[in-house]
Amino acid sequence: MNYFELFNLPVAFDVNTSELADKYRELQRTVHPDKFAAASEQEKLLAVSRTAMVNDGFQTLKDPIRRAEHMLALKGVDIRHETQTVRDTAFLMQQMEWREALEEITHADDPHCLIADLYQSFGDFQKQVTAKLKTLLVSEDDNDLQAAADQVRKLKFMAKLHVELERAEDALLD
């Protein structure tokens, strides 16, 4: 299922989230199971199925990582359920540095400064990865698509690391 087609949006990494939300509400009005209360069981089941598809499409397109995974899947590169990691040595070294910095937060003289530095570092890195990803996603070349998949893997790692940083920050407030 091409969710971009479902929502009548161009296949692109950047999505107008207001337009997406408007189209989501519009689709929900047409497929919501309540509209089929007096319909046959088969029509009710179909309405439930369509509603689930619209909901999944909306969740996929509003999340940049899931959107990128969907774009790759449309081009035959399905990484949505994989466990493969990035084999980029420089990225692996950066991961280790970030993890060490996360562990230092509780012992740092100024943990809030360290947290701010990590947020800045994460944000800068995510911007670089996202810019590269946008370029690679428009390609039809298999090597570029595999490189795009690696960029998505990096973003997934960064999302997990961001959650860990938020937890560390919350722990300081407790």
Swiss-Prot record:
Which residue range or ranges hold the J domain?
A: 2-74
**What is the name listed in the Swiss-Prot or TrEMBL entry for this protein?**
Co-chaperone protein HscB homolog
Assigned protein family = Belongs to the HscB family.
Please name the Pfam families in this protein's record. HSCB_C
The gene it comes from is hscB
Give one GO molecular function term: protein-folding chaperone binding
Q: Which organism is it from?
A: Shewanella amazonensis (strain ATCC BAA-1098 / SB2B)
Write down the SUPFAM superfamilies for this protein, in alphabetical order. Answer: Chaperone J-domain, HSC20 (HSCB), C-terminal oligomerisation domain
Q: Which keywords label this protein?
A: Chaperone
This protein's GO CC annotations: iron-sulfur cluster transfer complex
